[in-house]
Amino acid sequence: MTAFTSRGVFALLYARGPLTTEEGSAGSIRWLPQRAVYALREKIAAIWPDGDTAAFVTAELTGDRGGMAEEDAAVMTQAGVAHLFAVSGLHCAFLVSLLGLLLPVRRRALGAGLSMAVLLFYMVMVGLRPSVVRACIMQIFLLAAPLLRRESDGLTSLSAALLVILLADPFAAAGVSLQLSFAATLGLVCFSQRLSGFFKGLYRGEKRPVRAVVSFVAANLSASLAAMVFTIPLTACYFNTFSLMAPLSNLLILPAAGWSFMLAFVATLAGFLWLPAARVLGWGVWALVRYVLWMASALTHLPGHALYFSNRYLKYWLVYAYALFTACAITGERRRKYAVAAALASMTLLLTVGLNVRLSRYGDMNAMAVDVGQGQCTLLYAGDQAVVVDCGSSNSYVDDGSRAADQLESMG
């Protein structure tokens, strides 16, 4: 299985002669979702002349990051909030919440039916990616459960979503997006409630404002940490990185991103009715997008904001940390053991990072060969100065520049 087969692509064809065009079925209702997403992109560009904001909103609403500046995309990834652009449960929850605000239907069945129809159309419109298919199916289960007088079960709906996806395309199991989406959701289902209860239990006072703040922080932190439980090994394997700032980033950025998503959706829909009104709403979206990018950039300037598995000792630390917390989970109920485990994991992490920095510098000048898949890449470094000689091949599936940058970051 490859990345192509996971997306249902089993053959690559190359044109050798001149291209010819023929009349097709562009006007067919079959292509309505594609025409809708095209119209959405055109309207976004008309509402926000600022290219950076338009690209951010397009990525947020449709998952298409092709227009984003490389710097903005890299900042969001390093801050641990790139999942905002992977259309998933977060977007579906925002969309259902927005529908509840815009369409205050008294009848629960009618409201649930409208929400399901919109979710299915949105799912097809953004391209039937595994993450959005999983999210929409789980959201439909959640909406349908009260109507059928049943309780919604997270593991059941998650399993049903996986079954539907694999029945349609068994090769999708090799897709990175499917693995990350289901791993994050499994962590949320298994651990989010427990972690939230633990954090809320740290404050035993009765002051409502303080309790509201504690509940808000607990909900965000528990969701971030729970989603990371099973995704950290995958991000280490596929992206060679581990964002230490992800919980803090989600706490500071996610609320603003949620409001920007809903306001951008309303502004874009308003743009089809009256463009000046949409541009007025667009100023609010612009401010929220500026805040998100500024905050993400500020967090990535903090020392140690991310760790790179170019540090060969970091993978051993990761195994140690998982073994440590697994041992805590299968032993007694005392909470103090988790504090001890966190302290031990933090101390050994500092030792791991420091050891790699120390051992990567043997003298006044050093040379290192970096594995970039195909071709060669050599680092020459002395003190705080470094030079990259060659940087692999453009035919490699590895992002050569990112791999070299990760190696330099891991050496301090």
Where are the language model's segments positioned?
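Membrane-helix interface "capping/anchor" motifs
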Residues: 103-112, 146-156, 332-337
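Flexible glycine-rich surface loops and low-complexity tracts that mediate binding to linear polymers
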Residues: 1
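Divalent metal-coordination and catalytic microenvironments
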Residues: 60, 88, 127, 177, ...
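Internal transmembrane alpha-helical bundles of multi-pass membrane proteins
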Residues: 128-322
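Aromatic-rich juxtamembrane segments at the membrane interface
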Residues: 5-138, 143, 229
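Glycine- and aromatic-enriched alpha-helical transmembrane segments of multi-pass membrane proteins
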Residues: 214, 218, 303-366
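Conserved beta-strand hairpin/beta-sheet module of binuclear metal-dependent hydrolase folds
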Residues: 262-265, 361-411
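Hydrophobic, aromatic-rich transmembrane alpha-helices
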Residues: 95-102, 268, 323-331
